[in-house]
Curated annotation (Swiss-Prot):
Membrane topology (UniProt): Multi-pass membrane protein
GO terms for cellular component: host cell membrane; membrane
Subcellular location: Host membrane
Protein's name in the database: Protein U91
Highest classification ranks of the organism: Viruses, Duplodnaviria, Heunggongvirae, Peploviricota, Herviviricetes
Alphabetical keyword list: Host membrane, Membrane, Transmembrane, Transmembrane helix
Gene name per UniProt: U91
Claim: Transmembrane is one of the keywords in the record: yes
Length: 156
């Protein structure tokens, strides 16, 4: 029975390999998340700069059009305001959000697996120590029995 358990259970080296792979996955997911956040922030910054540029152009054209009739200025404003609102909102693309979410899920999965692998290690270590302590206590009892009752008297 003990031979079967040794074949089925992972060795210490295998556990270390699993932990190393999980740590590499964590680093990859974290780097991916940081990169995606940087990309989305750059996109927002670019969008903000474009919105400011559009607003400045709108102001300059409004000042130039002051000499024209007020109806033409009012009809031009709603279109430009809608364009500037769209650019100001500037949400990050959906693929960036999807990749960030996927990276977060991978990160959480890796952290859970590290905890599980570490608990396997501690369980196996405690089982080994319990078996060793049991064996040493049996040896101690045998030696005490021999000291108290010599073998010649036990055979009688």
């Amino acid at each position: 029975m003990m031979g079967y358990e040794e074949k089925v259970s992972a060795t210490g080296k295998t556990r270390l390999k699993i932990l190393a792979c999980l740590i590499v996955l964590i680093l990859a997911a974290a780097i991916t998340m940081l990169t995606l956040e940087i990309i989305s922030n750059q996109k927002r910054t670019t969008t903000d700069l474009e919105a400011v540029t559009v607003a400045l152009k709108h102001v300059s054209t409004s000042l130039a059009n002051c000499t024209e009739s007020t109806t033409s200025v009012h009809t031009a404003n709603p279109r430009k305001n809608k364009e500037s609102r769209k650019k100001i909102e500037g949400k990050s693309p959906s693929w960036v959000q999807a990749l960030t979410t996927a990276s977060g899920i991978i990160l959480l999965f890796c952290i859970m697996m590290i905890f599980i692998t570490c608990s396997w290690t501690t369980e196996k270590d405690t089982e080994k120590s319990e078996v060793q302590s049991y064996a040493s206590s049996v040896e101690t009892l045998d030696s005490l029995n021999e000291a108290i009752i010599p073998k010649t008297e036990m055979n009688v």
